Swiss-Prot record:
GO terms for biological process: photosynthesis. Its main location: plastid. GO terms for cellular component: chloroplast thylakoid membrane; photosystem II reaction center. It is a single-pass membrane protein. It is found in: Plastid, Chloroplast thylakoid membrane. NCBIfam families: PRK00753.1. InterPro entries: PSII_PsbL, PSII_PsbL_sf. One of the components of the core complex of photosystem II (PSII). PSII is a light-driven water:plastoquinone oxidoreductase that uses light energy to abstract electrons from H(2)O, generating O(2) and a proton gradient subsequently used for ATP formation. It consists of a core antenna complex that captures photons, and an electron transfer chain that converts photonic excitation into a charge separation. This subunit is found at the monomer-monomer interface and is required for correct PSII assembly and/or dimerization. The chain crosses the membrane at residues 17-37. It comes from Chlorella vulgaris (Green alga). The gene is psbL. PSII is composed of 1 copy each of membrane proteins PsbA, PsbB, PsbC, PsbD, PsbE, PsbF, PsbH, PsbI, PsbJ, PsbK, PsbL, PsbM, PsbT, PsbX, PsbY, PsbZ, Psb30/Ycf12, at least 3 peripheral proteins of the oxygen-evolving complex and a large number of cofactors. It forms dimeric complexes. Belongs to the PsbL family. This is Photosystem II reaction center protein L. Keywords: Chloroplast, Membrane, Photosynthesis, Photosystem II, Plastid, Reaction center, Thylakoid, Transmembrane, Transmembrane helix.
Length: 38
């Protein structure tokens, strides 16, 4: 409780990595669907 900065940093890092993971899954889904329908 005395040092909230490292905990806040780790939470922001996890949120950023989660957003990158969702973006990567979205891009792969678009590429896969375009490959299937072509």
């Amino acid at each position: 409780m005395a040092k909230p900065n490292p905990n806040k940093q780790s939470v922001e890092l996890n949120r950023t990595s989660l957003y990158w993971g969702l973006l990567l899954i979205f891009v792969l889904a678009v590429l896969f669907s375009s490959y299937i329908f072509n």
